Amino acid sequence: MRVPSAKLLSALGSGWQVPAALRRLYADVVWLQQLATDELRPGPGRIRTSVRMAFISAVGAALMAALHVDSALGPVTLWVALYASTSRLTASEGLIMIVVYAATLIASVFLAGVLTDVPWMLLPFFGVATALGLYALNKLQLGGAWFNVVVGFLDTFYLCAFDPKNFGWSVAYSFSGIALAIGVLVAFDMVLWPDPAERRLLRSLADTLDRQGQRLAAIGRAYLDPLAVAVLPQPAGVSVLSSQLPLLERARRELGDPQREAILLAAVTTTERIHIEIERLLAVARDDVPRDIRLRLRPEMNGVLQTLGAALQHQAHRAATGLGPSDDSTDEELNTAIRSSLDTLQEREQLALSERPPAGAPAIANIAAFNLGLRRIGLRLLNKPLGDVHGLAFPQDMRSGATPSGGADPALMRHSAKLGLAATLAYVVGVASHRSELAVIVWTAVIAGLPTYGATLRKMILRMVGAVIGGLLGLLMIFVVSPNFESLGSYLLAFFIALFVAAYVGLSSGRLAYAGQQGGVSFVLAYASLSPNVNVHEPLWRVWGIFLGLVIVTLVFLLITPEYAGKAIVPRLTRILHAALELLRPASGMTEQRVQEINMDVTLDLTQVLGIAEDARMEGRHSGIVPDSVVEVAGTLRRIVHHLSGIATGRLAMPQTALPAEIQTARAGCDTAVRYHLQSWLEVLEDEHGPDRRRILEVAAHFTPDDLAVPLAELNEYLSGSGLGALASWPAAARSLLLAELESYSRLVVLVTELDHQFVEIPAAGAR
């Protein structure tokens, strides 16, 4: 009889105590198994994308070998561009990139020749040039192959140190390799094999929603199983948000359409919030309490689960078909069915609970929590079409991705300075070793230091693992392929196989992605050559250089002012709250254009907040924040800003309309109440000591339900009485705007109250 390993340990005789080391080993094995299952599961388009990345890289490497371009920087540039690109590469952008590469390499040849004679200036210049170059690229939001502009510039100084008389030829080969890499990428992105990010994102959303529907159904079956035989799903180890955010950013750059960007962002946020609510339902369902009360509600709960499943299926279909205009009749039917089933369940629940004796308190609390989760999913997340942005208008001439032009970014300056120091230390180590093959130590310091927040140690460990695996794979190809096959086809096939594996792993979440990406870089550096090469010494030195570069970057980032996600998220939430308050107290020069600009700025900030939440998942308790609560706050703030911008736009449309004194007083009271709550949270974030749990709890304790409900009740009372008759003489458009404003206030009361509760949950347990 086969006994599962988990039961085997518990079934051991009581006379033998399992050693703690064995228990830890078993736990680690189970964790690795779960990690591999979660991360390496085929997703929508994952195999296709991996094949595309590997094929393009292999074709580029084979082309460079056929043309006798003796530089590993070309294949590396192509691989880095494929996994780190923020958008597809157009012909005009590719031409600009080649011109910039040419200009920087020419300048580097001249400067290297001059500074070689003045070594005391070389190291300071090296560090400052690295920091300034990376700061400029990040400030301009230029990623992917653009980072190798700095790599190529710095590589010239390394080449000059070992061959000051003839290093110009090596620089020329580097430029040829980079130019070919860019040309290959442009050809595939634009003509041979285009891969729009929006299509990939929509496939991912559709697949995620479909999986969530299946997961919700499985939880419901197990929760309502009278015999408790059905097994609950395992808690999700990670969300798909980390894979969707890069696609969202690429789609934003490719589309250049603010309205479409907002729709995609709303869809991603809603999908993640559904994921969070379903995981909360799972946590409730795992409680071991009596089942009799839930079985009395089984027909009604099954009805709710079926309607929610149908709504999720409809949302998945909308994502799969492009998030086009919604079918109002279908949406209305689903909303009616959801509300009807939830109302029926609520009535039946109240009747059942009234008949339940006090001894069943745990079961009562459990069923109440489960049904509340169902209501949240049905009435807050599935009550609108996926991607709904509340009917906002967007500017037609504003670039989505525009960033504020004024002022320096202190966090980015610190990050760039650290990379400058790391690159300088790597240069010193490489030159002191007297090995020209260690040029990759400088490349690694720049490539591995792409801007991220938090989880430095874990990310660098993953990169080191990837470097070792990629290097070993390159050596394996040298031992197996090179002595037996000499054709260009075998060279291309070896590249394709190795880079397919690296690309597939690199498309995982942050828990494995860095290993796959770095593994691809290591393989390219170890195996790239002009002809089959059986000499392993040069590849070994390159792999060693990668390892040294990663160690240097890790030490610099861990020892010099390390930053965690909890710190990085504060300025973004602060900017969003400032934007909301600007809409609440508009200046005299406020225009509809400014309202739209505020909306787009908030959209960009929220995208960053979601990314930092994923970093916090990797950091765990060290981040000081709860990632799920951050995602909840992001979604709530997005809806608050959208409602406030709708109110501001409506008021700008009827500035000359004389309002009755009662309406003016009630509106002012609503504005004051919302402003009080938002301003209080802004002051918490701007505190010189930073937000801490005690301060957040103190602020939340001052809020009462009447803060928001009383002004709104006064406005409703007036309009329910004589106020509505007083509006009869108003123009229809003005009357509609005022009633729409009242509806927005009704939603703001709920949203601001939710925000108060969600802010309290942001600090992690034990955080200051």
Residues covered by each model-derived region:
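A transmembrane helix-and-boundary motif of multi-pass membrane transporters/channels
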Residues: 1-260, 367-371, 382-628, 632, ...
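Soluble C-terminal extramembrane regulatory/interaction domains of multi-pass membrane proteins
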Residues: 204-226, 267-393, 636-768
